[in-house]
Amino acid sequence: MVDVYNELGLNYDPNFEEQRNLIDVYLRIYFPKIRPEEFISILDFLNESASDAKKGIEKNKIRTVYDTIKNNLILENEPMRDIEITKKKYEKEYVKLFKENYVTQSFIRAYLLDRGKKIDLFRIFDNFILNENYPFIQYQPPDGTPRSRYNEKYLLENERKEIIMKWFENTPWGISFKVRVSDKSDYKYMAINLSDNGRIDYKIQWKEEDMQTVDDIDKTYSFVKDLIRKINRENERFGIKLKIPSDDQFKFAFINTIQKFELPDNFAINHNDLSEFSRYFFPYVALVIEPRKRQSKTKTTERDERSKFGTYLRYKRVSKYDNKTKIEHRIVFFMRNYEYNDQSLSNEISKEFNITEEQALEEINAVRERYPNIKKSRKVLKKLENIPKYKPPGIGVDIQGKTRNNYKMRIAGARDRAQLNRIITFMNILIYLYAETYLYKRPDRQRMKDLLQKLTKIARRRNKVDEIVNHETPIKSVKQMTNIDRKRLTSKTEDDQNQWTRDCQNSGEDKKRRPQQFLNVEELQKLGYVWNPKLGDINFGHYERKIMVDSNGRTDSNKKKSEVVLRAVMLPLDDSGNNYVYYTCGPEENGKHMYIGFLKSKNPYGEAKPCCFIKDQLYSKNNDKRNLFLKSIGLIQNDESEVNKIVGDQLYILQSSNKIQEGRFAFLPKYLDIFLNAMLNNERVIKNHYLVSTTTGYYFKYGTKQDEYRYLNAVGSVLDLSIEDLRNKLSSSLTKDKNQLLFTSLNNGDIRAQFGSMESYLTYINTNKYLEYPLLNDLICSPGVINKYGLNIIIFQRKIRIIRKSFEREKIREHYYIVCQNHENIEDLIDPDRETILIVKEGKNYYPIILVKKEDENTKEVSITKTFQYNSNPENIVSHIFKYYEVNCQQEFKLLIKEKSNSNLNAKETNKILISLGIKEYVPKYQMIDARFKCRYLITNAGYIIPVIPSGIVKNVNIISTVNNYLKDYTTTQKYLTDLSKLTKNKLKIKPIGVFYKDKRQKSYVISAIMTEGYDAVPIIERSMTSEYIKKEKLLTQGRPNDEDIDRDISRGKSSIVVDKRVYEVSKNKYETETYQLFRYHLSYFLNNTTEGGKFKKEIENIINSEDINKRERKLELKNVLYRMTNADLSKTFNQLISRLNKQFGGQDNVSDQSENQSENQSLESETSPIVRELNPLTQANSPISIIQEPDTIQIIPEDFVPGRRNNLRESFVNTDVDEFDYSEQINPLDEPFDYATNKEPMAESVPFPKNEKTWLSIMPDSKIIDYPSYILKNNREYCYINKNKDACNINKHCAWNNSKNLCLFNVKRIQLIDFINQVTEELIQNELRASEILRRGEYFVSNIVDYNVFTERPGERIVMASNSNLEKILSELFGKENIPRIGKKRYKFDNTQTYEQLNFDNPLKETSIWYIQNIIDNNNTVFRAFANTYYWLVHPYDEVSMRNIGYYSPLQTTLSNIYKSQVINWLLQQENQDMIQKISSYIRYNKVEDFVTKLSMDVNTISSGIVELCILSILYETIIYVNDEYFNVIYVLHPTQGIVYDYKKSKNKFTNEKYQSYKKVIDIRFRYSSNSNYPDYIDALYPKKNN
């Protein structure tokens, strides 16, 4: 603490201005409690010439402070003396009262590095190899995007994934290791965190029953030490060795303990007395008062005199406890930064410091009085609701327990063992003195009590006694409860399932069903719960209490009472075995509903939900309720064999809802009921919700189990199969599929492409908990899997659309549409042999639709039909659905996007047509599939290749992977294609119309395929074809790559890459770029870590810092030093050249730069011409190093020697992207702890490079050939020096073994070294950052990592980055779509959906008497977006308005606009459209079509009048487009065949549409101009109401 007297000094006499400055600045910063008037008194006191009267004010204050301190010491000395005397004399007596102290929680840390050092956590994360003891590691870098690496096998085989989800969600800074600490449980893990400063932290938790003492904490150190050894072992080759801390170097952040004790002679604690007694020892503890828990005023029996709860203290003898000062500082903090009023501020202060609100108001007023002018820290203050957490001072010490057998002392927050022991000793003495004083009532202790009581009263008046009010309330709010037990009480809000808050809700004053929630046993014991090892006759330990209640559940009435036993249920919060939650019910809170039990409904995790009931479920006569209770507390296992159990009366028809009990009937939703019943004239008679009769039959929803396997449960209920039966049938069918025809056909090949192998798909079916419709439906429906002829499953899916309009309430509309699972299998629906299942999907629930018949009103017998078959009867349900199903299966893409290939057929359709011909040679024999397992060609018996669109395979045709064996010549192929087109009456669009060429020459083409009228390619034997012949035959030509060859090369991987010029140049560029970086890396090591290098470093720094020589001379001197330290021959040559040049131009200041440069080049011609001949001139344009080349010479001195030709080599450096990394098992990269304080790289000490060695690199001949294409760039840069033998050294292309020195050196060509030295010289002189890296100044160093976003991949491991665009897909494969964990609580995810909704809400659909008007986002491909909106409206005539309009801005609109734009660009580039282009070119600026295409392809802004784009779209989509002005007058008309038929600028007459009224495809767009520009400022989509 700075002393103000010493700071100012004797006789300090400032003037008025200096005084004001001191008061405003100095005192406010260092002595804020000194008032301005007090400062004047201090100055008088320091002035020796001041009068005694002036000095007296400060002297009196000093005397007062001294007396206060002296009296405080006297007050504190007495209780401390009593404690110390008792400690010395009665140790045996007070120690025997207490049992062993057990640890419940502890947070421990240790430091692995010296102060000032850093760890590169990237290295540790990248090198860490996972195994069963370390299955998961997470790295949170400073950029805030967590990277998780996990053992894939472990997670896939682990069925209980809730704990794994938490691993992903919790993202601490640094690296977090999950370490297995128990062999008894697969889920017993400890999280160990490592930060970049070398601090390692971990937390351990135990239960009291584990009986772990402080000494047992030492045993956990071994897990940390083993982890450090593993890190060091994986980096041993590089000498990376983190310190393994000794046991005494592990420090506690906090320790929580629990200790039992017993009072002698059957005495019991009166907590009121103990609380009062603890006040007397105010130097040690402060009392925490809990008003809610204090004793009531009315006392009846002796038992009632004992407090029902405990004594709560805060241990004060800790550093910085000063509670009074902290309160003051906290109030000032709030006043400066937050909006507040006195009530809210006092409420917050009372909570944080555990004082009453009255005391808090007093403190606030005192602060105002002391600091009347507190300035606000900002203009806009924060809200008081969003304040940071505040930890109360002191260490919590709680004495709890109602009965003498359950007294416990809990200590929370001790900082170390010594402090813990001091607290335990004091509390032991306090309890001993309490017993002596209040229980035994010893006379000498009574005198001590009286004295302490008097001193305490004095101390209280002097504010030395803290009385703390505990405002911590028990967990009661729903939000708090659900936050603690998310597994049971919360689930993602779905329409299909009620939340726990609704299922177990309070209603009125007499129905309180929500239970109480507790997190520790002590809170239960306060309520009187005791441990009982048996539950009835079952050995099952639990807590229970006995109370007397009347028939209304009241304990305080005069009615007859009976004893009841109330139990608490203990449920695990996770699978760690450490964390539990307790639920209880009682008459005090719940009235009659005093028994804890469980609801029948479960949440998505399958966990039963606790609730309070009037009757005890354990003794219920209903076996189902009793078994539910026993299952939920873990006494009996779930019976998975229960299938489709019917609950309740089936004939009671439930209303349409999202939740239907198993086996019950419910009405279909309104529109489905109309579609399936009213439209088929089905009738039913219902009375009081009971089904009386239905002679026609009536379709209802059928309830099934929906807590897990929802889709399979729905299907199984129809087929009377259990989940296990279904799984076995699915697995069996795949196992028998030897040729993988079935597997390849599923979802048209998408299943095989997604899972890769059948084994992965089988694993998914047999182990995944979330088996849903998209991935299973095709397999279930396939013939021979479940049913001999196959199944059809039709799903009616609900879609909710929220309609929002300005100034109106939002409307919610439900729509049901038929899901089209596979548009290629539409005809399967009308196969009379197939059985059809109807299912309605609402939210995530699947419910079968069944037909119920009941002809006799007097009986309960009903006929239920669960599956249906097709026939041509119009009243047949399948026939009724089919026409709608067929329409719904029309591909949206084909409706909205016009392409020439849209008329082509898939493999199944083509196969059907070929078989129908009845000609054997045209019957398909094989089918060729591509890399995505889509069928591309059918090969007939005659070997004819028939193209099909990429589609699902034909199940009974064998698969091949290439058509090369069936290629025919051009003439033969053309003939059979023409013949087959005629035979099929042009159903197959395979008539030849052109050719695809592989290569184009001057007068000919190399033809590789024939182009059909469907623009498909039919491969042929390659041949040359002249341009003249192609023109004569009127054939279209198009260059097209061979997709089959591309797919084949991709599947082969890197081994199939053909090394051409491009591959060679890219590989060479990559090699040379990395060679230069490695040169800098080794140069930096030599300069900073060797004796000889250190000498050169001093020379370099002297040259750089010299101000006596100019920049050109500094560069020459630097080059001289660099050549001397690298190669003697080059150094000699360099000096000779400098000498010759100086002689040649010596004294001639005006010699031209050009003549000097020419002279230099001529002097080097004879020495360097062999080098030049070996250089590949093709590499110079892309070379990352600037090799300066002339026809016959190469410069050893760069051109900047001549000032007129200075060239910054750094600017010519090409920093190419890393194209290829070595992802295989690499040499473990270097973990680089970096000592920023000493400029020394710790790992460098272990590099086996002699300190006095002068040779640090070797030079290879320039003629040496390097295999560039085989070069693999490693992400981890390594010193060549670490290779200890010749074999290891020569593996690296950048290293060479020196036999004479027995050392591995960095290897470089002479020509490269010259340029490297030139470039390093530039960096040292002109680039301070790069120079600092080489010279290792401060925190700078040459990076030994190429890319920090690239990690080493290992078999069986997977890396997930939070920034990955496929993050949700990856996590859904692990946890299911319903349970995707929130990485970092979704801190890094941007929700686009909300943005789209907000944009559309702000720009709603408007309407006039004849138009609906939708404005379109401007300057964002607006013309194409407007066309997308209007065309979408046009092709969806039967949808309602809200569904037809795709809005102001949406993802679908973006996709369509991009496609339309690409089609327009493509149309403009096609030669056959030149005639039309000429007609519309006047609407293109300067008639420059090429410039227009370029600008259109690169810009999203509105860059034209929009007429050209719309005209082309009109042609492509055969649509008339009317362009209207702001007043709905037609200003342009665009016709699909005639082009621009009306332009208001060129026509004097107003447009009339009589001529085009019969045209059906018409769309309207409106242009609005806000200036004189020819380009529209705003564009709207117009929808006519007449067609609605």
UniProtKB/Swiss-Prot annotation:
Keyword Thylakoid: no
Subcellular locations according to the entry: Virion
Sequence ranges of Polar residues compositional bias: 498-507
Superkingdom per UniProt: Viruses
Sorted UniProt keywords: Virion
Basic and acidic residues composition bias: residue spans: 486-495
Gene Ontology CC annotations of this record: virion component
Chain positions covered by the region annotation Disordered: 486-515, 1146-1176
Transmembrane segments: none
Low complexity bias spans: 1150-1169
Protein name: Uncharacterized protein R327
Lineage of origin: Viruses, Varidnaviria, Bamfordvirae, Nucleocytoviricota, Megaviricetes
